[in-house]
Amino acid sequence: ELLSYLKTNKSVTGYGLDLDATNIEQCLQKGVNVIEHDLNRGLDSFASNSFAIVVMTETLQSVEAPDQLLLEMLRIGNECIVSFPNFGNWRCRLQIAMGNMPVSQHLPNSWFDTPNIHLCTCRDFEVLCKKLSINIIEKKYVNSQHNSSPLIKVAPNLLSAFAF
């Protein structure tokens, strides 16, 4: 959906990567360029500095080596935009305190069938970027409706559902 929006409204040329045949078919029906590719195999098939911007939307938590994938994204692109569900959100914390793994609109799967294998918080992501010497140019924290607020900005690790 993001690539379709960017293509239609911002005249962006881009490529999506996906493994799911249904998702690939939907992209093609919308006129979005898509390549069947497993992100867990890395991005070696792309030359360095191939793209101005590389975007990963709500996928970081489901890859085997998110740290290596971030470095690969920066190898093939000048900048990256990454979004992920914030596992530090108060609703997630409350469910854990009640003895359950979180299930919510932005984390809809039960613990036994989730594709999410590396859940992280906003703070965890920032620590990883610092460890990898990745400079975060801009941060945005939003609720489950993708809206920001002054309150979320005060305590993003606790109050945001997603981080960009």
Question: Positions of the model-derived regions?
Answer:
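Short, well-ordered alpha-helix to beta-strand connector turns
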Residues: 31, 51, 77-78
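S-adenosyl-L-methionine-dependent methyltransferase catalytic module, highlighting the catalytic core
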Residues: 67-72, 79-164
